[in-house]
Amino acid sequence: MTTLDQISTLTQPRHPDDWTEIDSAAVDTIRVLATDAVQKAGNGHPGTAMSLAPLAYTLFQRTLRHDPNDTAWLGRDRFVLSAGHSSLTLYIQLYLGGFGLELSDIESLRTWGSTTPGHPEFRHTKGVEITTGPLGQGLASAVGMAMASRYERGLFDPDAEPGASPFDHYIYVIASDGDIEEGVTSEASSLAAVQQLGNLIVFYDHNQISIEGDTKITLCEDTAARYRAYGWHVQEVEGGENVVGIEEAIANAKAATDRPSFISLRTIIGYPAPTLINTGKAHGAALGEDEVAATKRILGFDPDKTFAVREDVITHTRGLIARGKEAHERWQLEFEAWAQREPERKALLDRLLAQQLPDGWDADLPNWEPRSKELATRAASGAVLSAIGPKLPELWGGSADLAGSNNTTIKDVDSFGPPSISTDEYTAHWYGRTLHFGVREHAMGAILSGIVLHGPTRAYGGTFLQFSDYMRPSVRLASLMDIDTIYVWTHDSVGLGEDGPTHQPIEHLAALRAIPRLSVVRPADANETAYAWRTILARGANSGPVGLILTRQSVPVLEGTNTEGVARGGYVLGDGGSSEAKEPDVILIATGSEVQLAVAAQKLLADKDIIVRVVSMPCVEWFESQPYEYRDSVLPPSVSARVAVEAGVAQCWHKLVGDTGKIVSIEHYGESADYQTLFREYGFTPEAVVAAAEQVLDN
């Protein structure tokens, strides 16, 4: 437990020479607004916003290069509040700095329809770079932002001296004890060191208090030493009021261009609340009227007034608007000089900012003849990437140590990273395109989000579908933000085979389809895979993340597949003898490797004079977004005899087959065997589909 003497020492102010009384008043105003806002809401997190007031003020008013009038400015520094529970740390700065929030928004904290929700939300509040709240995600995504910054520099201004390009900027992060405890930050921080991300500066709010109180009960490591071991540049600043130490640490971090920087800032949560300071009660609850009043007295505020902001304080802090405009104008001159020097790269930037694809980008997409050699859809995906890679320099990505299995490597490109990490297999270049995430699936998901949020490139990452479980928090957050991340998930069923049930996805398709706004795309063959990539890349901006689900095993190249049908999510692959004058007797709906089973079953049923429609349904989400007229044309409401076939749990198919339909599925874990044996033993055969069809017809 921190002693009273330590608290006294850690709360002694140290201000730079140009710090004024107005600056101190602004910092105290931040503290009072935090207590008032949480008190009015009845819940929230006041303590961190109080103790981090000097840091937040120093960053927003004295450090960050940003423009309140243009929060999408290409040259801005990025700020990530990984400690999203302390949303007031960010909201109050957005108010003081003139980014669009007003005092009434602070008063409306955590209420219906407000622009100040409990945790910061991307697009919901101007000036928020990323949705945070699930701890660890922000720091991990900031690693992606730093990687994106370097890659984009390579696209647009690779020959500029360090710090001399209009594309050079910093990524600042505030992380909490909780962030540090989350595993995703360990994964991402390790990779950040490998990548030598000198543009990433992380402030660790080391207050040693969480909801359950003193973190001694859960966190006893030397965190600074851990980050030194990763290979970060590490500094320790004693005291949250130590603005001199904070600014010196920032200057030192900027000078350490060969590695990311970690600044451990020892703060006292809830300062200067008289009785709840340095307690868990200051972390996640309103302080109470008496404590708020006492805090105001300590700071020289009228305890009977709420949300009090001196006119000279807001005038002073809104000076950031003019300073930001001036910084933007200086940058604009550098940018225009660059544009004159680099017209071709400027044209590329314009295309990417307009979110357009170049003419003919898909002209070389591979096409496979029906009944040609069978091919795994993961292999087809790899062929697609290598075909479109030369035309889409904005597309980059890799795998969580499964590149050869996921087929995620674009042919003939370097790996992304400092040349010193090159191996016999891979040549690394600062601006390479192939990403090596290592066995860090969770970090990969968050890093992909950071890359896409930073903009304007497109990033993808691959692993086995079973390991999407490790990525789920990042995938959900990407879906919440509606950002265009691409996940390549291969080895998509018991068809994985001999590795056995630990690696065989069973419930994963249903679990992923349960995530709102995530599109789960499972193509039936090589051509549907190419069509899926075309659709994914051609969709409009902010269409949400996509999971591309691919087979390990080879599958036939089918007749009748088409790009428009894939783009619509589901379509009639074959009608088995029916015509407009005759509806099918039964509809077989299938995805992925099971479409071939439906096609084979259709032929067997035709021998029995049963008219069968086969519907390929690569993406349920895309299909359900189509007009009713189209959906009814594919699945006529008058045909209630329906069978769905998918090598996963049946959970999501009931709504399409109805109460009278049947689902050929797997409701248990698999075993270690070759995929042919598993499919046969688990009933994924044409004969099993025929039996299901006959049963629904009998009913």
From Swiss-Prot:
Family in the record: Belongs to the transketolase family.
| Entries under InterPro entries matching the protein | THDP-binding, Transketo_C/PFOR_II, Transketolase-like_C_2, Transketolase-like_Pyr-bd, Transketolase_bac-like, Transketolase_BS, Transketolase_CS, Transketolase_fam
So which domain of life are we looking at? Answer: Bacteria
Q: Where on this chain does thiamine diphosphate bind? A: T48, H85, G133, P134, L135, G178, N207, H283, F467
Give residues annotated as binding substrate: H45, H283, R378, S405, H491, D499, R552
SMART domains attached here? Transket_pyr
Q: Which reaction does it catalyse?
A: D-sedoheptulose 7-phosphate + D-glyceraldehyde 3-phosphate = aldehydo-D-ribose 5-phosphate + D-xylulose 5-phosphate
Q: What is the top EC class of this enzyme, as a single word?
A: transferase
Job of this protein: Catalyzes the transfer of a two-carbon ketol group from a ketose donor to an aldose acceptor, via a covalent intermediate with the cofactor thiamine pyrophosphate.
The question of whether Lyase is a record keyword is answered with no
Which is a GO BP term held by this UniProt record?
pentose-phosphate shunt
Instruction: List the active-site residues.
Output: E441 (proton donor)
What is the designated name of this protein? Transketolase
Please share the entry's free-text remark on the cofactor: Binds 1 Mg(2+) ion per subunit. Can also utilize other divalent metal cations, such as Ca(2+), Mn(2+) and Co(2+). Binds 1 thiamine pyrophosphate per subunit.
Keywords carried by this UniProt record: Calcium, Magnesium, Metal-binding, Thiamine pyrophosphate, Transferase
Q: Which gene encodes it?
A: tkt
Report the EC number(s), separated by commas if there are several: 2.2.1.1
| GO molecular function terms listed in the Swiss-Prot or TrEMBL record | magnesium ion binding; transketolase activity
